[in-house]
């Protein structure tokens, strides 16, 4: 009896890149950037090391690809959540919840993004900072639309505070002291602190 060999499916370049990034996020998060090897990533994907270099050029290029994808995903989930809101309070609440839900459901990416000590000097750290800048600009734009009388400096200051508070609360949830705090609870804690001041500002302006 003659056996028929089923041809292996060929992945598109985009599909292969996604596979590589999925594996790289896991390996970098598990081992840290410096200890991780391209061999380990290639083995996890099931390809040869030259395939990784063909897609990303270097280990740092692979790291930057991981960070860039996380940046795009985070903006997508937070902007989609905010777009569903019907008022400013709901906009903040849904945005915060989307942020914490994303981190909870993408824990390897989260570990990678915030292991700053493992990132190489230069491009890697700059790319991580670009995520903060992206979220700050996004929040500032939302706030400016709701409080145009506040002015750009005040709105940017508010956005910096919000992004910093989100990041610090997320870091606290990684440790033992905050490990039992759910995404919903974290959202409520932020709203308790931040919405009071913003709501008062709206009341004073007659918004």
Feature locations, PLM:
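Alpha-helical DNA-contacting segments of helix-turn-helix folds
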Residues: 61-70, 113
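Short hydrophobic/aromatic patch on the recognition helix
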Residues: 46-56
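Short secondary-structure transition hinges
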Residues: 94, 101-140, 152-153, 171, ...
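Amphipathic alpha-helical packing segments from all-alpha helical-bundle domains
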Residues: 72-75, 122-147, 156-160, 171, ...
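Hydrophobic alpha-helical connector segments
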Residues: 65, 79-105, 150, 158-162, ...
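Basic, helix-initiating cap at the start of DNA-binding domains
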Residues: 1-31, 35-47, 60-64
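Short coil/turn segments at alpha/beta junctions that flank glycine-rich nucleotide-binding fingerprints
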Residues: 30-34, 85, 106
């Amino acid at each position: 009896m003659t056996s028929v060999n089923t041809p292996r499916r060929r992945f598109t370049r985009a599909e292969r890149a996604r596979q590589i990034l999925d594996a790289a996020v896991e390996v970098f998060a598990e081992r840290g950037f410096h200890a991780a090897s391209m061999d380990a990533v290639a083995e996890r994907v099931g390809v040869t090391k030259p395939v990784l270099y063909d897609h990303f050029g270097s280990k740092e290029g692979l790291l930057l690809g991981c960070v860039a994808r996380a940046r795009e995903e985070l903006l997508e989930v937070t902007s989609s959540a905010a777009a569903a809101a019907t008022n400013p309070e709901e906009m903040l609440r849904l945005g915060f919840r989307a942020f914490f839900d994303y981190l909870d459901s993408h824990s390897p990416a989260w570990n990678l993004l915030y292991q700053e000590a493992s990132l190489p000097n230069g491009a890697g750290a700059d790319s991580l900072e670009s995520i903060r800048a992206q979220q700050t600009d996004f929040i500032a734009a939302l706030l400016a639309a709701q409080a145009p009388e506040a002015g750009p400096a005040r709105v940017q200051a508010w956005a910096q505070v919000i992004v910093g508070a989100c990041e610090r609360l997320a870091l606290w949830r990684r440790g033992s002291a905050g490990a039992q705090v759910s995404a919903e609870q974290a959202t409520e804690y932020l709203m308790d602190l931040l919405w009071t001041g913003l709501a008062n500002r709206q009341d004073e302006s007659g918004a």
